[in-house]
Each structure stands twice: as C-alpha cells, then as structure tokens.
Curated annotation (Swiss-Prot):
It is found in: Cytoplasm. NCBIfam families: PRK01117.1, purA. This is Adenylosuccinate synthetase. GO terms for molecular function: adenylosuccinate synthase activity; GTP binding; magnesium ion binding. Pathway: Purine metabolism; AMP biosynthesis via de novo pathway; AMP from IMP: step 1/2. One of its GO terms (cellular component) is cytoplasm. Homodimer.
C-alpha cells in the first residue's frame, strides 16, 4: 500500500490541514513528524471549525490512529489542552487513537522565555518567531541536553535533568532581561517539576515507542499519511535562511521524524495556495503592497492560526514551486484557495526572476540575492464566478481552468487536487495518491 507525505510547497499556511483531513479517509495512520505548536491547522467540517497545533488533522476521523513522532517538540500543556478540547466535542473517544513518541522532545518554560526575549533583543532584524519555544527546544535537542517525553514519566530523572539545565537558562535570561530592562522571570525547580510530572501523568496513556508501532503498520501494509508542518521555504536547511523555522520541513524528514526508513515513503504531495503568503520577516519576491494584496488578505482570511498576525500576500511564485518540487520530489500538487481569486480581473504568475540584469529561472541560494530579485510576471485573465459549489474540474470557469493548467506548466508539477472553499467538501480531487 502506498504511504504519502503531504508537504507545504511555500512558506507555510498553504492549507495542508484541509488536504490531510480529506486524504485521511483513505489512510489508516496519520503521522506528524516535525515542528511544534508553532504550526496551526484549521479544519472546517460541516461548517464547524477546528484548530489543531500538535495533534494530526486525522483525529477528526473515527477509527484512524494519529501519531506525534520523535521529530516533534511537544508543549505538554498545549497537547493536554487539545486532547481535552477534542474529547469535549466527541472526538478521540478511544485513547488508542493517539500515540506520542517517547523520544519526542519537550518544551519547558525557559524555552518560551528565551524565544521571546531573544526575538526582542534582535530588534529590527527579528526573525518573526512565534515565541512558543520551538527553536530553543530544538537547540537543546541538538546540544544533547534536551528533555524527552519519556523523562516526564520518571520524576527522579526529570528532577535531575531540570536541575542540570535550568541554571544556564536562567543565566542567559538574566542577561537578556538586563538588556531589555525587564524583570527576570521566576523559575524554580519544585514548581516546574510538579507541573510537568502532572502533565506526564495526563499524557502517560498515549506515550509509546512510535517507531516500533509504525514499522509494524508498514509490515502489515497499512496506508500511512505523513503530515508536514510549516513549508519548504521555512526549512532550516533548504529555506530562506536565517528566516526559517528550526526543523526540517521537507519530505526527506518524514522518515527521520517518525522513526522509519526512507523506503517506507512512496509519494510526496505538495500543497500550494493559488497565490503566495508569508508570515514574519524575510524575502518575498512577489509580495503585494497594494489594494490587491489587501483583498487577498481579506478574502483569504490571511491571519496566522497560531499568532493571529496578518500574513504578507502576493502573486503565485512559480520559481518557488519549482524549487519545492526539486527538494521534495513532488508527485503532485494540491492548489488551495482558488476561490479567493474570484473577482480579480487579471492574475499574475511569476515565471522567473531578474537579478542584476540577468534572467534567473531558479531560486537563489542566498537570501540577500533573493531580496534583490525582481519577479518576471505572466498575466492571465481572471474570472467573476464564485466557485465554492464546484465539485468537478470541468465545472470551473474556463479562465480558472487555464490558470490551473498554467500553474502546472510553470511549476512542472501536475495539479491533482483543487480546493475551492474552506469546508472539507469544497474540494476537487483529481487524483488520489493512495489509489493512482
């Protein structure tokens, strides 16, 4: 049976949650393999809106198993809150539906404080972090001083590890607070230990060796869907560094972050909006600073799920999509929010860049070069029809069909899914990755 990775092909917020929710019908297991609660997936099912930050989107489907892999950094309080909220609404009736890797790393209060105060200290060169402690938690992981989910279940071990890490974190916080003129937050071992052992008890029924579970599912031929967070251009290695997140968002990390071998993955499906958005700092060649940009933001409800920050909006960037295809090995692409373009008289697609008088077809590796490029646009005619009721490709207005086909040509990736509204049902699935 094929196993499929769903990955963001832009700077995140592409609509991955909706596509994963749609494809979960055909999968048996859904895996989150990187990031933390800096990601937010918004799902609308039957007009009811659900926002998830850590638990995979497939949890809204009864009988599906959702896994939070070892590559995720977990804020236990946020996770417990999501579990409780889902149960109140009638989801997650069986605890066996959710597995948390015992090797996933944990976000502690000092991580969030360091994240916020470091960002404040950057001033005008701020990266745009969410302040959720994601980066500092990954930093501790790589420095081999991190605390994992398994440690929450052993109070003595947890105390030892908090005592080993907290003093250095407090020293840095004192320096940062002195620079900012702020009081130093009070962090003490007994309070942190009590809180996190309590959270560990709440999470204990869900904690497992996720790698062992998933390898067993692969052997049994289960269909597994890997749910990426953020997007390709936010990848710590392949994104617009340093304006990136702290994890690998590309498809290659799906195996590493879930504890499987790379041969377990069969197809990679990229997700792209019909236009482009970005949150926070960093280069954005097709960004619009005009009424059209404002219209895209308003009609697309482009405000961060996690932070509420307004997203920067611009035209679709074919150079970015070609790059995403290259580094992820895209089998196909879902084009989301096509309905947001309804009513625009003309549309533009960036097909290449101009850099220092030269035409550039590929994404520059240096973010300073990317900040200097000028987009080369191709203009297409728009459409006036509202398309939320469309359920087949042939029902789309002719100009909408031409737009989709041109996106395929510019990106080099077939469009296998088109989203025409926020609800799960407002989708045209042209090819099912689990069947074709």
């Amino acid at each position: 049976m094929p196993n499929v990775v769903v990955i963001g092909a832009q700077w995140g917020d592409e609509g991955k949650g909706k596509v994963v929710d749609l494809l979960t019908e055909h999968a048996q297991v859904v895996v989150r393999f990187q990031g933390g609660n800096n990601a937010g997936h918004t799902l609308v099912v039957g007009g009811q809106k659900t926002v998830l930050h850590l638990i995979p989107s497939g949890i809204l489907h009864p009988g599906k198993t959702c896994v939070i892999g070892n590559g995720v950094v977990v804020d236990p309080a946020v996770l417990v809150g999501e579990i409780d909220a889902l149960k109140v609404r009638g989801f997650l009736k069986d605890d066996a539906q959710l597995l948390i890797s015992d090797n996933a790393h944990v976000i502690f209060p000092w991580h969030k404080l360091l994240d916020s105060f470091r960002e404040k200290a950057r001033g005008g060169s701020a990266i745009g972090t969410t302040g959720r402690g994601i980066g500092p938690a990954y930093e501790d992981k790589v420095a081999r001083r991190g605390i994992r989910v398994r440690d929450l279940l052993n109070a003595d071990r947890l105390r030892t590890r908090i005592e080993a890490r907290l003093p250095a974190a407090l020293d840095e916080l004192k320096d940062l607070c002195a620079q900012a003129g702020d009081p130093v937050p009070q962090l003490e071992v007994p309070q942190i230990l009590a809180e996190f052992t309590g959270l560990g008890e709440r999470l204990k029924p869900f904690v497992h060796d996720a790698s062992l579970y998933l390898s067993g599912q692969v052997r049994r031929g289960a269909r597994i869907l890997f749910e990426g967070a953020q997007g390709t251009l936010l990848d710590v290695d392949h994104g617009t560094y340093p304006f990136v997140t702290s994890s690998n968002c590309v498809a290659g990390n799906a195996a590493v972050g879930s504890g499987l071998g790379p041969t377990a993955i069969d197809k990679v499906m990229g997700i792209s909006k019909a236009y482009t958005t970005r949150v926070g700092g960093g280069p954005f060649p097709t960004e619009l600073h005009d009424a059209i940009g404002d219209q895209l933001r308003k009609m697309g409800d482009e405000f961060g799920t996690t932070t509420g920050r307004p997203r920067r909006c611009g035209w679709l960037d074919g150079v970015v999509l070609r790059y995403a295809s290259r580094v992820n090995g895209l089998w196909g692409m879902a084009l989301t929010k096509l309905d947001v373009l309804s009513g625009l008289k003309t549309l533009q697609i960036c097909t290449a860049y101009e850099l220092d008088g030269q035409k550039v077809m590929e994404l520059p590796g240096d973010y300073e070069d990317l900040a200097r490029v000028k987009p080369i646009y191709e203009t297409l005619q728009g459409w006036d029809e509202q398309i939320a009721g469309v359920r087949t490709f042939d029902e789309l207005p002719e100009n909408a069909k031409r737009y989709v086909r041109r996106v395929e040509e510019v990106s080099g990736v077939p469009v296998v899914c088109v989203s025409v509204g926020a609800d799960r049902g407002e989708t045209v699935l042209l090819q099912n990755p689990f069947r074709s």
